[in-house]
Amino acid sequence: MPQGPVNSTILHAMKPKVGLPFWAVRWVSLLLLVSLAIAPLASNATTRSTYHVEFDVALDPETSSASVRIDLSKRAQYVRWIRFKIDPKVHSDFKGSGHIQHADNTVLWEPRGKKGWLTFNVKIKHQRSSGRFDALITEDWALFRGFDIVPQARIDMKDGTQSKSKLRFQLPEDWSVVAPYARYTSGAYKIDHAHRLFDRPTGWMLAGKMGIKRDTIEGVYVTVAAPKGQGARRMDILAHLNWNLGPILEVFPDFPPRLLIVSAGDPMWRGALSGPGSLYVHADRPLISEDGTSPILHELVHVAMSARSAPGADWLIEGIAEYYSLEFMRRSGTITEKRYQKSHQQLAKRGESVKRLDVDLSYGDVTAKAVSLIKMLDEELRRKTNDKMNVDDIVRELADHSGNVTVDLVRSIAKRITGVELDWQPTNAEKNTAKAAAGVGID
């Protein structure tokens, strides 16, 4: 609260009144003045003190690696230690101020001062079991996620403090870079995750000689970027979002205000993967698959929810994402009602042979079966609430949930919002899926 003259209302309250002893007037006056003095302190009590973190990343195509420097400044003494979870085959050559302790898969850094710095090298080349890559640096471009350059970390710091972080890149000549963050006028990226006290880079990033298309769709600032000559359909992706981002925001009103979509061709992984405020999709992936679902919309559901599944419940998260990739296109008019029903028939048939849902990672047939189960959940919710509630109401709450998503959590949310127990039982998946197979045919 700004300091200034006491206003006339307060002065009037401090004047003696008939029948009020003089000592009482003085006590009232004193209490009012003390409250005015304390008010500014109270208004700042919830403001956390900040320490500054700067991440500098120098990309080197010749060695397929990056040199990373972390600088702590402005009250860096608030940070007692940072423990990084590393892969010794990927992260190496840790040096810095204070004390550094190496273990098998961790590096413990104690800055021990008002300022601190740490440097290390990281390889940007991660090959999946398929032989394709989800992180790669070439002569002309580099595609990676934030955790590929700054590993996962735990931090011990003074209570009531948080970081104020920036990210800068040093790039080869003629390269540019995109990341899922706003930029300062200096060109540095502002790293700000509201739910974290130590902000480090996350999400997909692309550097190199690239083509970029940008637009604001339904209030979301969208960037679509891909290396030149990769065959990525940037304008097609923007058009797809122009049709479907509206229905997404109706279900997920807290969708990130910025969205980055990066794309590339071979030898990158031929699929799609989400990250905070961003996603990657292979240049050859269709906007709409033959079964009527959309890889991009599927990943956007993950971006919107940021949900984690409990062990054995990955099918639930993947089923929700696949269900809505189809549902959003029905709502937007991208596909017809008949095509929508036909797609559900195809997915139900595909999932018929699945006997177990509790696999570690949901795959095609399991996810197809999960879609039918989510559809059954939606139908039961509508039936028991006379169309006042549906699966949207469940999913919105799951998006706000900070813990693991489970079937029991879904059932408890449903009971709370409807007041009744659900008949929906994923353990009886064979019976439920058979019911979902009925629909309107279309060639």
Residue spans for each PLM region:
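N-terminal secretory signal peptides that target proteins for export/translocation
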Residues: 1-24
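Second-shell loop/turn segments in exported
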Residues: 226-238, 282-287, 307-311, 360-364
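Beta/coil-rich, acidic/histidine-enriched accessory regions frequently appended to metallopeptidases
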Residues: 29-30, 48-71, 401-443
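Non-catalytic architectural context of zinc metalloproteases
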Residues: 49-51, 59-60, 65-71, 82-242, ...
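Bacterial N-terminal signal peptides
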Residues: 27-39
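Long, well-structured alpha-helical subdomains associated
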Residues: 335-383, 395, 409-410
